[in-house]
């Protein structure tokens, strides 16, 4: 009989993923969240935040390439980039692969977790925090944007989902926040973001985010990719007022990958463009969605995976 250690991740109250743990690397509680890092046979190191898997060593490159490069490659010359969240440093790592980048500002509220990543997760950041183009700001992203006058060519939003009615991240998923992001984009700028899992039990989460972003930007395009460490598809968004980010001109993405000499492990130009081809049921869900998340009534995700709205009382 196997008496090993196991981590149980409750996707909903009715579905659970079980992972065997080889050893515990680090665990603790910051002012913002609980963290737990363990070693597994299948996926290497696994980062848990508030009891949910956030990233795994073996496949993090799939998630981070999917998040970062569509936005970076649709922009002809991204020089200044803002990253909202992204505590492990892998989003920053991927942004800095683009030689056009002169400055990349990463704003994360949880400085303690960033230090955990620096110490225990070098496979993710790979020294990105030490790059002279990188600027790390420990602050609430909304407060930072309300205070700064800096503008960016690309903004990448890499946040945890707003799970739970008391989750302060809810205020980073509102139309007012997306308008604030847009106000800090240079002309021709683009926003890219993680936009929730695409799962039958969570069928409205991505459509609600998409519908909300549409209130702030002229062009909004969804795309998706399978993330093995999550055992499901994740949704992402590109948004811009200047151009349709999914209207790919033939050969442009491939040419930019070649010109920038990008060392990609997962994405190719054809695959990147194919991620924007969505199935009929998802297209219909995006078309039918009416919920818009606002500061007065921000949305949140219930333990069952439902999208709900309620005033934030935090």
Curated annotation (Swiss-Prot):
One Gene Ontology cellular component: cytoplasm
Q: What are the record keywords, sorted?
A: Cytoplasm, Polyamine biosynthesis, Transferase
Domain named PABS is located at 4-241
Enzyme class at the top of the EC tree: transferase
Gene inactivation phenotype reads: Cells lacking both speB and speE genes show defective growth at 70 degrees Celsius and significantly defective growth at 78 degrees Celsius. They accumulate agmatine and N1-aminopropylagmatine.
Kindly state which reaction or reactions the protein catalyses: S-adenosyl 3-(methylsulfanyl)propylamine + agmatine = N(1)-(3-aminopropyl)agmatine + S-methyl-5'-thioadenosine + H(+); norspermidine + S-adenosyl 3-(methylsulfanyl)propylamine = norspermine + S-methyl-5'-thioadenosine + H(+); S-adenosyl 3-(methylsulfanyl)propylamine + spermidine = thermospermine + S-methyl-5'-thioadenosine + H(+); S-adenosyl 3-(methylsulfanyl)propylamine + spermidine = spermine + S-methyl-5'-thioadenosine + H(+)
Where, by residue number, does spermidine bind? 64, 88, 158-161
Task: Name the family.
Answer: Belongs to the spermidine/spermine synthase family.
Q: How does it assemble?
A: Homotetramer.
Q: What does this protein do?
A: Involved in the biosynthesis of polyamines which are thought to support the growth of thermophilic microorganisms under high-temperature conditions. It seems that long-chain and branched-chain of polyamines effectively stabilize DNA and RNA, respectively. Catalyzes the irreversible transfer of a propylamine group from the amino donor S-adenosylmethioninamine (decarboxy-AdoMet) to agmatine to yield N1-aminopropylagmatine. An efficient aminopropyltransferase activity has been also observed with norspermidine which produces thermine, and spermidine which produces spermine and thermospermine.
The identity of this protein, by name, is Polyamine aminopropyltransferase
Which organism does this sequence originate in?
A: Thermus thermophilus (strain ATCC 27634 / DSM 579 / HB8)
